Amino acid sequence: MFVSRELSDASGKSIPPKSGIYDYITLLKPRVMSLVVFTALVGLVVSPVSINPWYGFLAILCIAIGGGGAGVLNMWYDADIDAVMKRTKNRPIPSGKISSRKAFVFGMVLSMLSVLMMGKFINWFAALLLAFTIFFYIVIYTIWLKRRTPQNIVIGGAAGAFPPMIGCAAATGTVNIESFLLFLIIFMWTPPHFWSLSLFSSLDYGAAGIPMMPNVRGERSTKKQILFYTILMTISAAGPFIIDFAGIFYAIFSTILSVIFIYFAYRLWKADTYDATILMAKKTFFFSLFYLAAIFGILLIEFLVWYFIIL
């Protein structure tokens, strides 16, 4: 599956658009990668076993490379639908700046390199978990689920939830209940995040033939499920405090953030006009980005304060 666009000069001869380093960086999905790296870092730092800072850096680098490689392969496979959607039509492959072949090779090299580096320098359990995450994101989500079911991001969301477990595995050689709770928070966060996006981008998804929840089940059902998963997410977010993995600082601030998230989801559910729905969907979407970063940030700050100041 290769998508290519070319320009023409005055004589009608085709001229491939020029590609630069920025286009290759764009293929890595840097915004998504930054969240992957951050959540993996938290999983690594708060694990019960300390890791040498140099090896910790290498582990996070491997996760970043693997996440970037997965992003490239996702853009490679989705180039046809990216060309249709307004939000994605200017990405490097559909715009013709990078050929599908180059993108595929780039993504495969990064993905394999990340796994081999993780196994060689860190441990093979973390490497296998990283390889499984890349496989899950590309094969299970991108190729199998995304174009077939409105539950695509519910199941496929597991791929984005694995990084904290990989971080923990890099430090300890295994996974534990703490890393699973971090996985669960991201897993439950994914549906409200992406379905709120799909509410104000439903025409785009519909034109591309992607069966997102609003296009298949309707707006009302989508809003109800956003509220439902938001509640499940906030329960999951309380988990670290309940099992004494996090302290009172985390409990207070995560509760405040969770209440705000539920408020936005409730307002979205009650919105009875198109304009009100779009407005609340955008507010819910953008707050969800802040929420996840803040939850993990609070957990990290609390751990560092306890480790370096109190102990």
Curated annotation (Swiss-Prot):
Bilayer-spanning residue ranges: 32-52, 53-73, 104-124, 125-145, 153-173, 180-200, 224-244, 245-265, 290-310
Catalysed reactions, as listed in the record: heme b + (2E,6E)-farnesyl diphosphate + H2O = Fe(II)-heme o + diphosphate
List the subcellular locations.
Cell inner membrane
Q: Does the keyword Cell membrane apply?
A: yes
- How would you describe this protein's topology in the membrane? Multi-pass membrane protein
Which key words are in the record?
Answer: Cell inner membrane, Cell membrane, Heme biosynthesis, Membrane, Transferase, Transmembrane, Transmembrane helix
GO biological process terms on file: heme O biosynthetic process
Q: Which GO terms describe its molecular function?
A: protoheme IX farnesyltransferase activity
Source organism superkingdom: Bacteria
Q: What is its EC number?
A: 2.5.1.141
Give the metabolic or biological pathway. Porphyrin-containing compound metabolism; heme O biosynthesis; heme O from protoheme: step 1/1
InterPro entries, per the entry: Protohaem_IX_farnesylTrfase, UbiA_prenyltransferase, UbiA_prenylTrfase_CS, UbiA_sf
* Main subcellular location: membrane
GO cellular component entries: plasma membrane
Q: Extract the NCBIfam families matched here.
A: cyoE_ctaB, PRK04375.1-2
> What else is on record for this protein?
Carbon 2 of the heme B porphyrin ring is defined according to the Fischer nomenclature.
The record's function comment reads: Converts heme B (protoheme IX) to heme O by substitution of the vinyl group on carbon 2 of heme B porphyrin ring with a hydroxyethyl farnesyl side group.
Q: Which family does it belong to?
A: Belongs to the UbiA prenyltransferase family. Protoheme IX farnesyltransferase subfamily.
Q: Report the protein name in the record.
A: Protoheme IX farnesyltransferase
Organism field: Bartonella quintana (strain Toulouse)
What is this protein's gene name? ctaB
